[in-house]
Amino acid sequence: IFAEDEFPPNSGIYIRDLGPDVLLRSVAIAYRGAKSVVASPKVRKTPGSFSQSVRVGDWLLLAGQDAVGFNRQVEAEGDLAGQTEVTLQHTMDILEEAGGTLDDIVKTTVYLVAGQDRSKFAAAYRKFFNRYSRSSRMPAGLTVEVRELSPRCLVEIDAVAYLGD
């Protein structure tokens, strides 16, 4: 149904309690116009069935990024602030490949492993945006606590960006 390099962006997250008798919850965004896959050579291509990002019109939908590098090792292992910075750098690299900047992000969804100090994440997140963003505007966001992510990863972030005028 999808060409090998044209899978939709995706974040694979385990959430323990979706509700009574709920086994799966899925959200899909459909678009009938032209779509293009955008991938940065600076970011590791994850084996599997999703793209780093997909551009639909002026919108860029970015798959969840984490702190795993090209060597398949987690960068800043055990350090939530460090992993947040690496994860946001991956996100920014993909945005730049699409011609965007951090200022174009309108929403992020953050997945934090349970038991992490959210204030450390929030401080690293704000610091990164303050350093690389031209505006003081932060994107809308949602933070979800999860039981686990990729092995040794403490944070994963997916994003939606608007690249229009």
Predicted regions and their residues:
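N-terminal presequence-like segments and the immediate start of the first folded domain
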Residues: 1-89, 93-107, 112-165
